[in-house]
């Protein structure tokens, strides 16, 4: 009686412990997720290009169950856990069978580990013991409560060992057969899925006879467990092909692991936030053509050893190619990605300054600008050749890349406004960041690229022009979805069409088929040679120089970088024609301009001509013809030249009122239209300049400067 009571108590205690044990266990999936898979990189067509091995140097991939052949799934269930879908993590029927077989034989000849228990063992390896088995069983039941059978089977097939450093069905399929797991037939699946019991003993590359014996046993298990019809096991074993690869040569895994396009993949991985399947926008064929062209041109430049290029698809804003080094394996600095390095940009920033001036209504392509010696304090810029042209059209000043006209425009726009512009183009840090103070120290010299910018950021900025003035961050991924707040209108389509017209006026030597809008740049001291060009389809940036900063006489944008840019574009369009430029006639209407100033003609302008203007931005009237001096100026009634205190929302609401009506209003060089005298406009803290212009030319313009403080 006492013995029976004790047995009953022990049984009750054991059953209670068995029932409650899972509630004291944590989820094994948390440890599985620490076993990260290989990172795979794919091109824009979905072709696998590169594999980075795991942190523990394993071959392991995470693929969904749907990408594993049903044959492989059936084989693994038959061989490892035929009643997988009928238990809760522990197969009590298998436990009873194993216990009886082991008891009657006097030794352990059979196990009862389910797929769930094996997965726990993979997640949390422990020394084998009865205690370990109990813990595994409890954790397996916990896992089954938290996760579906589909999830558990997927994790298992992705993590089971297949010999050496091969883990998971996908890595095994690639290593042993050169196939994806989806392509495995029944013979191949049965050979592979026999490995996990003793992975290294059954490896077909080292022990083919043992592997075939194990395969035959697995096929018999499939037949016995109802996964195959009677007689099918022998039929598959004898007749279905085993497409084993030639083991005398390295596997595809090895070839995918070789260095290639590393700089591109690094950028893509960062953007993908370290995802393990990275869908890159790279075009490998274009990249190879670009790399070849850069290498050919470097050999022709004395004292020049490095080059880089970035190619952006204007429609998608995808970085189609990034070449950051000519030889990644160069022991000195081959792994330095010069496409993201900060270098002096020379004259490459000038188109952005002209764009801003056009959008401010300050000028058009026919406006006359001075090219004479100029001094601002201690700063006295000169042109590259040391010569001056006195006066010339804006289009010529930009096309010839003259320095003093660009500096004059920055002075009129103000350096603060230009720095804000560069921030909008992501060429500099945001204006509210500490780094923005560094930009402000450069003053007017920012027109000549003294701040330093990267090839990638400059190419991204140039891509705004063929995109009609809309900034969208460039992406290295085909899966990127840019949030709406990242899209920003920087320039009007009118101004972009005008700059494109100017930059494509001079054809590059060798540009026989494409028709490129282009701009070169040379840093002070011949340290860097740049050329940026774009078509309706692509934006391309090219840099030549030395990574160690060593100058060379050959480093001139027009003679070093421009020829390479032409060759690359011709290579890109080798098998296709470029898209035509969109019709810009509606954006660039012809209007009367003053022959003396190239500004909007007034009745005071005795000589006039018809010139190109912007459709959406009024060009400022000519103020150089003599009648202006005889006219009474407009009186700006509000605001007054004084200090205003901002309201609670951080702005000051002020009316714009003048002594006459109508009036064209400009705020900080931005045209805002004909405001009603009863409308209020919000002004942020800082210095502001209001300019009033009479559209009827009966009064001369006037301006007022005031300050808003917090």
Please tell me what each predicted stretch does:
Residues 1-42, 83, 103:
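N-terminal type II signal-anchor transmembrane helix
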Residues 76-77, 222, 290, 317, ...:
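Active-site SXXK
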Residues 104-128, 182, 247-270, 363-418, ...:
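Conserved catalytic neighborhood of penicillin-recognizing serine enzymes
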């Amino acid at each position: 009686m006492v013995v029976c009571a004790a047995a009953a108590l022990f049984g009750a205690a054991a059953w209670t412990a068995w029932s409650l044990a899972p509630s004291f266990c944590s989820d094994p999936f948390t440890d599985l997720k620490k076993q990260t898979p290989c990172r795979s990189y794919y091109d824009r067509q979905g072709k696998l290009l590169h594999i980075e091995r795991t942190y523990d140097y394993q071959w392991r991939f995470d693929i969904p169950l749907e990408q594993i052949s049903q044959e492989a799934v059936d084989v693994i269930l038959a061989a490892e856990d035929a009643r997988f879908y009928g238990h809760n993590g522990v197969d009590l029927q298998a436990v009873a069978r194993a216990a009886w077989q082991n008891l009657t034989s006097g030794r352990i000849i059979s196990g009862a580990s389910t797929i769930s228990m094996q997965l726990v063992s993979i997640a949390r390896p422990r020394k084998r013991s009865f205690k370990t088995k109990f813990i595994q069983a409890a954790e397996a039941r916990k896992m089954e409560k938290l996760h579906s059978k589909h999830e558990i089977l997927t994790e298992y097939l992705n993590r089971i060992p297949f010999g050496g450093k091969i883990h998971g069905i996908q890595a095994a399929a690639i290593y042993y057969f050169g196939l994806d797991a989806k392509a495995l037939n029944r013979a191949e699946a049965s050979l592979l899925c026999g490995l996990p019991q003793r992975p290294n003993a059954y490896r077909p590359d080292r022990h083919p006879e043992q592997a075939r014996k194990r395969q035959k046993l697995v096929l018999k298990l499939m037949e016995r467990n109802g996964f195959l019809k009677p007689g099918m096991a022998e039929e598959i074993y004898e007749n279905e092909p085993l497409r084993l690869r030639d083991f005398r040569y390295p596997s595809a895994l090895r070839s995918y692991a070789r260095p290639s396009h590393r700089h591109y993949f690094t950028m893509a991985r960062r953007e993908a936030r370290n995802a393990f399947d990275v869908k890159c926008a790279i075009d490998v064929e274009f990249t190879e053509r670009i790399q070849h062209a850069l290498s050919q041109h470097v050999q022709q430049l004395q004292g020049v050893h490095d080059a880089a290029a970035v190619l952006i698809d204007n429609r998608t804003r995808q970085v189609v190619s990034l070449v950051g080094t000519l030889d990644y394996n160069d022991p000195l600095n081959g792994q330095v990605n010069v496409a993201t390095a900060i270098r002096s940009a020379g004259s490459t920033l000038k188109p952005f300054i002209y764009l801003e001036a056009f959008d401010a209504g300050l000028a058009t392509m026919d406006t006359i600008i001075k090219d004479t010696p100029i001094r601002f304090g201690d700063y006295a810029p000169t042109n590259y050749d040391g010569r001056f042209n006195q006066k010339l059209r804006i289009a010529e000043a930009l096309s010839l890349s003259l320095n003093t006209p660009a500096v004059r425009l920055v002075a009129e726009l103000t350096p603060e406004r230009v720095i804000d512009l560069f921030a909008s183009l992501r060429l500099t840090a945001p204006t509210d960041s500490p780094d923005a103070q560094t930009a402000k120290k450069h003053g007017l010299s920012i027109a000549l690229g003294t701040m330093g910018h990267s090839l990638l950021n400059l190419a991204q900025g140039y891509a705004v022009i063929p995109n009609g003035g809309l900034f969208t961050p460039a992406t290295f991924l085909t899966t990127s979805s840019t949030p709406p707040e990242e899209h920003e209108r920087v320039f009007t389509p009118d101004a972009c069409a005008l700059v494109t017209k100017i930059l494509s006026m001079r054809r590059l030597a060798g540009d026989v088929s494409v028709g490129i809008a282009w701009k070169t740049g040379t840093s002070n001291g011949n340290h860097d040679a740049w050329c940026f060009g774009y078509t309706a389809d692509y934006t391309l940036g090219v840099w030549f120089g030395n990574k160690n900063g060593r100058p060379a006489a050959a480093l001139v944008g027009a003679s070093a970088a421009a020829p390479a840019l032409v060759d690359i574009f011709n290579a890109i369009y080798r098998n296709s024609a470029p898209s035509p430029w969109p019709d810009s006639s509606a954006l660039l209407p012809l209007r009367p301009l003053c022959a003396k100033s190239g500004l909007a003609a007034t009745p005071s302008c005795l000589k006039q001509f018809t010139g190109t203007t912007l459709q959406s931005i009024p060009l400022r009237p000519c103020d150089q013809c003599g009648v202006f001096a005889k006219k009474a100026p407009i009186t700006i009634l509000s605001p007054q030249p004084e200090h205003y205190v901002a309201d609670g929302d951080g702005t000051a609401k002020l009316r714009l009122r003048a002594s006459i009506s109508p009036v064209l209003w400009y705020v900080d060089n931005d045209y805002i239209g004909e405001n009603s005298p009863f409308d209020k406009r919000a002004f942020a803290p800082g210095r502001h300049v209001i300019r009033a212009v009479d559209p009827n030319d009966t009064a001369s313009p006037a301006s007022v400067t005031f300050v808003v403080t917090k």
